[in-house]
Amino acid sequence: NLPHPETAYAEWLRVLAPKGILLNYDAEYAKDHHRQKLPAINAHADVSAELLNECHNIYHMLEISLFERPRWDLEILKALGSCSCSVDQSVGDRIYAEQDIFYIPVPMFCIKAVKN
């Protein structure tokens, strides 16, 4: 998680060449992590409860945890101007064609910003 995602977006757009494309593949993995029912064998199966709790606490300390994503991302990118943006909320189905131990049942999204 980024502590200052708005600043990150601004910097990424600043260094992007005109007509350059910014792709951000993300998901709100931690938002409802404590409520998710994961299979017994999963990518976090060997992570201690203490470490998972610490990650959860860090997530809730970050401002971005308060926002509805990817709507927030689009609003920020549009407010920063100089780009056209779109979101693909079905990208996770294509990335996770097979649900292996790394699969986390959280809808992924892809933000695409094209610099003017």
Ranges and model annotations:
Residues 6-18:
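A short glycine-rich, Lys/Arg-flanked "PGG" loop and its adjoining helix->strand segment in the class I
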Residues 1-2:
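A short His-aromatic
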Residues 11, 65, 106:
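Catalytic cores of large soluble enzymes that bind and process phosphate-bearing ligands
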Residues 97-103:
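Short proline/glycine-enriched turn/loop segments at secondary-structure junctions
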Residues 114-116:
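Solvent-exposed residues in well-ordered beta-strands and their adjoining turns
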